[in-house]
């Protein structure tokens, strides 16, 4: 199955975008696809071989899961690569456009349960939440 690629341009310096993308105190504020969900906890050991765990839960308590991965590559303010527990790979690229503009690109292996379009929409919704959070904080 082909990798899925999404991107968004954020009006903020790359250093801020990197920090807000990786710091657990920020991750819990933006890491959900819909307002009926939230991210109550986040742990992030941002180094090669380090692990992250973002807890995702429906606000009504009906469902929840841990989004877990292990870092394969970390280049400060430029790139992150990780793999999830099921072996799928994700790459996140932070591209400095200018002093106050950053393009974030996510490239990921889709899972087989849901349609590629549904996955693209879900991942993009989270990336868009991130975009709004960074520009408003």
Whereabouts are the PLM-identified features?
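Short amphipathic alpha-helical signal-transduction/dimerization elements
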Residues: 22, 127-135
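Hydrophobic ligand-binding cavity/cleft-lining segments
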Residues: 1-38
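Beta-strand/loop substructures that line and gate deep hydrophobic ligand-binding cavities in soluble
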Residues: 79-125, 130
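Generic structural detector for well-ordered beta-strands
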Residues: 5-11, 45, 55, 70, ...
